[in-house]
Amino acid sequence: MSVRIEHDTFGEIEVPEDKYWGAQTERSKRNFPVGKEHMPIQVIYGFAQLKRGAALANHELGKLSDEKKNAIVYACDRILNGELDNHFPLVIWQTGSGTQSNMNVNEVVSYVANEYLKKHGSKETIHPNDDVNKSQSSNDTFPTAMHVALFHEVETKLEPALNHLRQTFKEKEDQYQSIIKIGRTHLQDATPIKLGQEISGWRYMLEKCEQLLSESKKHILNLAIGGTAVGTGINAHPEFGHKVAKYISQNTGYAFVSSENKFHALTSHDEIVQLHGTLKALATDLMKIANDIRWLASGPRAGLAEISIPENEPGSSIMPGKVNPTQCEMLTMVAVQVMGNDTTVGIASSQGNFELNVFKPVIMHNTLQSIYLLADGMNTFNKNCAIGIQPIEENINNYLNQSLMLVTALNPHIGYEKAAQIAKKAHKEGLTLKESAIESGYVTESQFEEWIKPEDMVDPH
C-alpha cells in the first residue's frame, strides 16, 4: 500500500496515500479498533455544514482571507455532495467529545481545500486547526453537528414516513366506518365498535406523535457553536456563534440559532433526551398497533381472523402453506430496539460531568439509529401490510352476534344485576343472549329487538 507521511504534535505517522485524512484521524483509526459502528455519515454532513458556516463567519469577522474562505467552502460542499464519504473511517467508540471525528473533518477539509488552492495558483495553505477549526472546539462543534444532523433526518426521513402511515390509517378508517365488530378489553369481549373507529385510534396515535415530534424537534434548532471549550467562548468572536447559525440556516433552510446558554449546550443533552422520548412514545404506539393487527389477523382457521393482511413470503421451513405476519413482527422488533436505545440515550445524557458531557457519540448513534429504524420500519410496514388490510366480514359478524356483551345495552332498562344474570345464564347454558333474556322474563322479544341494536351501541349519542 502506498503511503505518505503526515504529522501532528505527537510526531510523524504513515497515512494511506489515497486517503485525505491526516495524522490525528490515522491515530484514532489505530487506537480504537472497536466494533463496526462507524460515525454516521449524516454527522459528517452536519460537520460540513458547520465548517462551511464557520469559514463564512470567520471571513465576515475579518479572521479568514477570501482565498481560504472559498477553499474551505469548496471542500465542505464536496463533502455535502457525498463525494468524499470514504474518507471518514472512524467508529463511534472514541473520545466521548467526538474530538477525533471533528479532526477527521478538519483534516479532510484542509486536504481538499489545499488541493483547490494549489489548482488555482494560490500560495496560501489551509491548516486543519488554525483555519478549518478556527474559533471552534470539538466541545461545541460535535454537539452542533449532532443537532444539525438530527433535525435534518427527522424532517426528511422520519416525519414523511410517519405521515404516510397515518394517511393510510385515515383512509382505512373512512373506508370501514360501516363495519361493526366486537370490541375487546382485557383480551375479553366488550361492547361493539366500528372497525373504522378502532383504526381511528391507531391513526390518532400517529397524529399525536406527529405533534409531539414537531414540538420536541424545535429544541434541536439550538446550537452549541460559539461556546468553544467550556462555554465561555474563548478564542471566538462574541458574534461568531450567531453568525455561524445564520449561515447554517441559509444553507439548510432550517431556522437554527446559537444557544443562549453555551454552558448548558456543552454539558447537557436534554433536548435530545426529549426528542428520543418522543421516538420512544412512537415506538410504544407502533408496538401496540402491530400487535393489534397481528392478533386481528391471526388464523386463518383457528384464530380471530377478523382482518386479512398481505401474504408476502412463505412463513415456515417445515409447515407448507404457512404465512406469518412478518411485517408486524419486524415493526415490534424495531419498537423494542428503540426502547432500548432510549435507555442508552438517557443514561449517557446524564453523564455531563462539570462543563462537558463525554458520551456524545453514543447518544448520537442511538438517536440516529432510532430515527432510521422507525422511518424504514413504518415505510415498509405501510407498503407491505397496512395498505392491504381487509376486513373478513363473515367472521366479524359471527363474533358480534355471539357476544354476550351486547347485554350492556339492557343496563338502562333493567339494571346492571339483571343484565348480568342474563349474560351468565346464556354463557352457562349455551343460549343466545336473546334466548336467555326472554327466558329470564326480564324483557320481551320486542323489547330485546328494540334495545339490542349494535349500530346504536357504536354511536350512542
UniProtKB/Swiss-Prot annotation:
Lyase in keyword set: yes
UniProt EC number: 4.2.1.2
InterPro entries referenced in this protein's UniProt entry, alphabetically: Fum_hydII, Fumarase/histidase_N, Fumarase_C_C, Fumarate_lyase_CS, Fumarate_lyase_fam, Fumarate_lyase_N, L-Aspartase-like
Enzyme class: lyase
One example of a Gene Ontology biological process annotation: malate metabolic process
PROSITE patterns for this protein: FUMARATE_LYASES (PS00163)
GO terms for MF: fumarate hydratase activity
Coiled coil: none
Keyword Cytoplasm: yes
Keywords, comma-separated and alphabetical: Cytoplasm, Lyase, Tricarboxylic acid cycle
Misc note: There are 2 substrate-binding sites: the catalytic A site, and the non-catalytic B site that may play a role in the transfer of substrate or product between the active site and the solvent. Alternatively, the B site may bind allosteric effectors.
NCBIfam families: fumC_II, PRK12273.1
Stated role: Involved in the TCA cycle. Catalyzes the stereospecific interconversion of fumarate to L-malate.
Similarity-based family: Belongs to the class-II fumarase/aspartase family. Fumarase subfamily.
Protein name listed in UniProt: Fumarate hydratase class II
High-level lineage: Bacteria, Bacillati, Bacillota, Bacilli, Bacillales
